[in-house]
Design a protein with these regions (language model features):
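Short Gly/aromatic-enriched secondary-structure transition segments
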Residues: 221-223, 234
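Functional-site microenvironments in short loops/helix caps that host divalent-cation chemistry
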Residues: 129, 133-135, 139, 143, ...
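N-terminal regions that are enriched for targeting/export leaders
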Residues: 1-26
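Short, contiguous alpha-helical
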Residues: 24-80, 115-162, 166, 174, ...
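Short glycine/proline-rich turn/loop motifs
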Residues: 82-92, 115-118, 196-202, 260-275
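Hydrophobic (often cysteine-bearing) scaffold residues that line and stabilize catalytic clefts
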Residues: 10, 37, 44, 98-101, ...
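Acidic/histidine-rich alpha-helical segments that form the ligand environment
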Residues: 6, 73-120, 124-128, 209
Length: 333
């Protein structure tokens, strides 16, 4: 079935994302808000075992009872959890045990789908699990990025792509009339509860930039003293800046001889002027927008602007395989 094929593809893609990593990489935790790759691999499996297999598989037996606590994240309704800041201490189970756990649950779930594939409630649970796992695919990469950024060897998760060659287009503005607009999920496909219901909201007229802010533009903000000017920052953002001694984006580094390098999943690379700036905090993005004489768009403004392009904006299931760093759209520089 289509659902069975999607299940296999999503699970295989998670394994593919982990494939370039060593067992040591998969166990490390760089900060309390991050999780080890091994934990992501196990937790996404725990989700299917707990919420799909346990209530639906005849004679259900857990792969390993202790995993119910170790790999629960925050689902209080199904029991206790291992403390998030201590996930990096889980040197056991070994990575090989977690991969065996994944294989076991996958085989059992596919057998369940073969028997009960027309069960609408079961289909909905599996779909939720797939959406959940795809979220963790993104989290896995962001956690690897933070982990590798703290390594003095500056390791690359993937070989560097060719640099962006096209010059950036002049920033222009696309105007929107605003008014009463429909937002929220309104189709028959999957949605999370916070995307519902579809409803009407009022938007004042607004405009969006025709391309992303690039690294050269953000470097100009830094050069102009952007991190030293309190009038550009929200009060909470300025407090964060001072408390953490923030002087530039998290993954930017001073290059020998001047200028900047930017650390990413392709390792440490020279700043690419026309490449989109990424990995900013909300406070940094807000301060830049104020410096540039603009502001950040609201969620509703983004949704209304993107709605006519929705089919083209849907990422293919293997998008993270083809491109793991933000890039400018064709023709925009």
């Amino acid at each position: 079935t289509d659902l069975d094929s999607r299940f296999s593809a999503v699970r295989a893609h998670t394994a593919l994302l982990a494939a370039p990593l060593s067992a040591e990489d998969c166990c490390a935790q760089s900060m309390p808000d991050a999780s080890p790759v091994k934990w992501h691999l196990a937790h996404t499996t725990w989700f299917f075992e707990t919420f799909v297999l346990e209530p639906n598989e005849p004679g259900f037996e857990p792969f390993r009872p202790a995993f119910r606590v170790l790999f629960n994240s925050y689902y209080n309704g199904v029991g206790a959890q291992h403390p998030r800041p201590q996930r990096g201490l889980l040197t056991r189970p070994a990575l090989s045990d977690v991969l065996a756990y994944r294989a076991n649950v996958e085989q059992r779930l596919q057998a369940l789908l073969a028997r009960q594939g027309d069960n609408a409630a079961l289909q909905a649970l599996v779909e939720l699990g797939l959406q959940h796992e795809q979220q963790h695919q993104e989290l896995l990469l962001t956690d690897v990025l933070h982990l590798f950024s703290g390594n003095p060897l500056a390791p690359a998760y993937r070989d560097a792509p060719p640099p962006v060659a096209a010059p950036a287009q002049v920033q222009d503005w696309l105007e929107f009339a605003g008014g009463l607009c429909e937002i929220g999920h309104g189709g028959r496909g999957f949605s999370f509860d916070n995307e519902l219901p579809r409803h009407t909201t009022y938007l004042a007229p607004y405009a969006l930039g025709t391309r992303l802010v690039n690294q050269a533009e953000f470097a100009a903000f830094i050069t102009d003293g952007g991190y030293r000017r309190p009038e550009l920052w929200l009060a909470e953002g300025w407090d964060w800046l001072a408390a953490q001694y923030i002087e530039h984006p998290l993954y930017w580094r001073h290059a020998p001889g001047g200028g900047w390098t930017v650390f990413g999943l392709h390792g440490e690379q020279p700043l690419i002027p026309q490449a989109p700036v990424a990995h900013l905090s909300y406070f940094e993005a807000d301060a830049y927008a104020r410096w540039a004489g603009a502001r950040l768009p609201t969620e509703a403004e983004w949704e209304v602007a993107a709605a006519p392009l929705a089919p083209a904006l849907l990422a293919p299931a293997d998008a993270l395989r083809a491109r793991i760093e933000p890039q400018a759209a064709p023709g925009s520089g």
